[in-house]
Amino acid sequence: MAKWWYGISAIIVCLDQATKMLANNYLVTEAINLLPILSLRLACNTGAAFSILEGASWLLIGVGVIFSAYFITQIWRLLSGSICEASAYTLILAGAIGNLIDRMAFGCVTDFVHFFYISNNDVYSFPIFNLADTAITLGAACWIYFMLFQENTNKSEGNKLN
């Protein structure tokens, strides 16, 4: 069963890398406004989420490798477990690998999705992100949900992979 989850993770990594390649090809000179609150704007992030640890590439590469190895192992060990748990591991793994590829190849992570809000000439901006960041966030939400609500009820409810 693990091979299916690895396959899904690989598809997400490929989509992440494809969108980053498109961003690097088409957003170099100017941003593209899609909606009044959404634009595609190229950014090179040398830090982690919200530019935390900016410039600490080797530390972030090490952390990315450790997290990737951990989630590869966790997926492999899931002979039976909840779909929520497997989804969490798969999404986090895909996001970690997607951003790790960028860090190792380019020294920074390509971000390009930008949500913002303009009110009374003030711009409220959410940090620019990418598909890998979205996968990590959704995976973390699934993992928290699993830890809080499903971990103890899996055996009785039959929400199993096998």
PLM regions with names:
Residues M1-N162:
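Alpha-helical transmembrane bundles and membrane-interface segments of multipass inner-membrane proteins
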